[in-house]
Amino acid sequence: MLARSRVCLQTITRRLADFPEANAIKKKFLFRKDTSTIKQLKGLSSGQKIVLNGWIEQKPKRVGKNLIFGLLRDSNGDIIQLVDNKSLLKGFTLEDVVQAVGILSLKRKLSNEDADEYEVQLEDITVLNASNKKPAQMQDFKLSAIYPPEFRYLQLRNPKYQDFLKKRSSISKEIRNSFNNFDFTEVETPMLFKATPEGAREFLVPTRTKRSDGKPSFYALDQSPQQYKQLLMASGVNKYYQMARCFRDEDLRADRQPEFTQVDMEMAFANSEDVMKIIEKTVSGVWSKFSKKRGLLTLDSKGTLVPAKKENGTVSIFRMTYEQAMTSYGIDKPDLRAPDLKIINLGEFNAFSHLNKKFPVFEVIILRSAFSNMEEYKERWSFLTNNSNYNYRVPIVLPIENDEQANSNWFENFHAIATFENPHLITKFLKLKKGDIVCGCTREPNHSIFENPTPLGRLRQLVLQSEHGKNIYHAVNKDVASWIVDFPLFSPVIIEDKSGKKEKLAYPEYEKDRLCSTHHPFTMVKLKDYEKLEKTPEKCLGRHYDLVVNGVELGGGSTRIHDPRLQDYIFEDILKIDNAYELFGHLLNAFDMGTPPHAGFAIGFDRMCAMICETESIRDVIAFPKSITGADLVVKSPSVIPESILEPYNIKYSNSKK
């Protein structure tokens, strides 16, 4: 221990060199408290003495022998000009932290139409902490507000990111107020849990505890509070919520982080309807208060976009079944800002796929008036046939170049994957025109659609993510919400391709007679399908519900199983979990001691904040996000741990070089 302390002290000595002079340090802590923000100056009169804290926004500029102009930025991101007649700003640099004292004065107007602006006649300025030259060297990054990730703290000083963090805080308060008004109790649950097969990979935490057989013991960081909140229902907590920290060792992308926040809730003596009503009111309230688009839209029974919040104050969000979503939009989280951009099943016209009997449906989606000439088509739509954009097969994409093609032989381009009994009837139905794009592909039959998204569902998603697609097909510049209900309770297990071949599989392949939970194993089956559990569980629908906004899953929930025998049957007989009691005995025991019926939901809080702040990545609304590789580049984590420290945890490096 002494040796380690010595190393640390030596490191500090090398970095800081001499002991700092006392007055220089003390001065940084002796600052005035009677300060204002720049916004508060609007209520003051010219000639008043003021004190401002902030940062030097730009390097001060000498404009005369006894005149220097500087800019001060306060913690709100507001900026005011400093007028220095005493050369007080001499030597100051970008991002110095200062306290400025001066006289408030009106800035000279260039014209009578200009609004009043203030400046400060500087009397004194104190450096509370000087900046090095790094911020000045990164001036170009400051202008774009895109800094290297290791300088995240500089990026967060930008008003845009300050606004994101403040709005996130305000949204959190609003959600808490909403649940408190519904008489929920906020309860914190443990983050150190145990490893269980809930879906995603877990982060494991080693301990110094050994089992009786000598094997090391590990915690798992909680993927979600799912099991703890069900135990709270068993504990007599009637309505629970928390802003929960969750951890999943997943492949990362713009809308994923290894640690994230979810708004978690659960209700005893409740079903799906009870939960959905509260979520509708809470989410709608947040959108109405904080979104620049002022509220959510949804669909009515005719498919027309209407406000989710009615004039009488009630909130009702459209419900779409999983089957409807997959057949009309090819994905279980459809972007309904383009409600009329639908996929068409040509089976009604006796057009079928002949390549794979498990994928017999041939369907198309028509991109109307998508281009004016072939040069524009190639420039704007080439990504639709990019193999890397799809999990499996790529749709056939056909631009309609002229009216003759539209009215006669377009379907010949799809003969490789489909058979047409009456192509002329289909042509009459589709009413193709020059400038349209016909996209066609195959999928599984209705009631058995597990490939999600389908190729055309993915194509539609790509279209609506592109700027040109948004401009053409979005019906509104608003946020559109829908519920997706009646999911399959179980899904076939996809066989992972471990062949090492560069060519992708054209179709997903499933393991025979093996199922996994579509969401998680605690979801209750729809009562009308209960008898199917015994013989044909793959045909059962679950009492699960997802809330989708703009093609993004904002959250999901379900009515839970609270009967121990049914839960055990699903673990053992359907999911084939051999050690179910070892993994889930705590739940089964609680269920066997009078756990009430319960249902719940979880909202992806980071995702919600990103949508309301109108930014593509959740990283923008998280103070210190992880990179695409899962690293925190500010603090340089994760890091290598010396083997001597790992030893008490019963962990050794393999192939370690000593």
From Swiss-Prot:
Signal peptide: none annotated. GO terms for cellular component: mitochondrial matrix; mitochondrion. It catalyses: tRNA(Asp) + L-aspartate + ATP = L-aspartyl-tRNA(Asp) + AMP + diphosphate. ATP binds at residues 248-250, 553, 604-607. Its main location: mitochondrion. L-aspartate binds at residues 198, 248, 560. One of its GO terms (molecular function) is ATP binding. Catalyzes the attachment of aspartate to tRNA(Asp) in the mitochondrion. Present with 1550 molecules/cell in log phase SD medium. This is Aspartate--tRNA ligase, mitochondrial.
